[in-house]
Amino acid sequence: MRRTTRRTTEKASYSHLLPASGDLDELVARVATSRSRTITLMPICLPEDAPSGLWIATGARDYIVYPDDADAQWRSGIVCHEIAHMLLGHDPRPGTSDLGGLVAAAAPSIDPQVAARFLHRHGYADAVEADAENLGTRLAAELGAAHTAAQGHRDRVFDRMR
């Protein structure tokens, strides 16, 4: 990994946002609160050639789109990657391919001019994607570890109650 990428993601302070429970929805709520913007998770049926995740930023609300058939781990990875873009201050930018069908499926109520500001990325070729992938992976890993630890604590409490 490039040194600049590592420095960029290390500057992002996010530990206060990670819930002790390891719950993804709680992380999303905390990020939304910290940014004073509602974040709506939108599972939808995506075409095979669509990106696996998408961040759509509108006036006061953010949408994170992910495949409706994503299992919990894949969903967490996608959502954490898109949240990483938010935490790193990346601006939504127009994509390089036609998103008309995806926009209509994901958020039919969004004005097409607003939709032009989609954050749409394919691959991990640029520094922005590398930074988001690095931080998103760290977020997902720490969230998973917190979830495992919380489950272990609950199991020990229940064992003592028996």
Regions found by a protein language model. Name each.
Residues L27, R75-V79, I83, G95:
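Amphipathic alpha-helical interface surfaces
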